[in-house]
């Protein structure tokens, strides 16, 4: 593994452990050339996924983009980073095990919304507003109506 500080290839793993859900191995490394310490994560990748965008363009699936969009939806919400990482891993596993090498951005959006719906109401509404391209207040009212008819004890509810 190349050192991110000095670009040396002479690095060693000092500590290695699985994450809570055992889907990722966290490795603590040290560069033998400059003593820089850094962390890497190792994940199983079942297949290369290609995303078919709404305009028909095909792009490689980007796990980091998924993480960023969830972090934006969950900004200032009482959800631990570990739960976000667990959710991202579950979404990626679901996508990879679906049997298709190409998957539409709409399908990804729906899967993300399913996971957010069971995690946090506010994040769900935030994500839905961008994903579904809300234009009017009634768009929000429709989603809020859906949420108020459900009762999931794992979810962080909207304030009443």
Curated annotation (Swiss-Prot):
- Asked if the keyword Transcription belongs to this entry, the reply reads yes
Question: Which spans does this entry mark as compositional bias, Polar residues?
Answer: 1-11
Pfam families to which the protein is assigned, alphabetical: ATP-cone, Zn_ribbon_NrdR
The free-text cofactor remark is: Binds 1 zinc ion.
Needs which cofactor? Zn(2+)
Q: Which residues form the ATP-cone domain?
A: 49-139
Q: Which domain of life is it from?
A: Bacteria
Q: Name one GO biological process term.
A: negative regulation of DNA-templated transcription
- Record bears the keyword DNA-binding: yes
UniProt cross-references to InterPro entries, sorted A to Z: ATP-cone_dom (IPR005144), NrdR-like_N (IPR055173), RNR_NrdR-like (IPR003796)
List residue spans of unnamed Zn fingers: 3-34
The region called Disordered is annotated at 1-20
Q: Which UniProt keywords apply?
A: ATP-binding, DNA-binding, Metal-binding, Nucleotide-binding, Repressor, Transcription, Transcription regulation, Zinc, Zinc-finger
The molecular function terms in GO held by this entry are: ATP binding; DNA binding; zinc ion binding
Quote the function comment for this protein. Negatively regulates transcription of bacterial ribonucleotide reductase nrd genes and operons by binding to NrdR-boxes.
The entry assigns this protein to a family as follows: Belongs to the NrdR family.
Report the protein name in the record: Transcriptional repressor NrdR
Upper classification of the organism = Bacteria, Pseudomonadati, Pseudomonadota, Alphaproteobacteria, Hyphomicrobiales
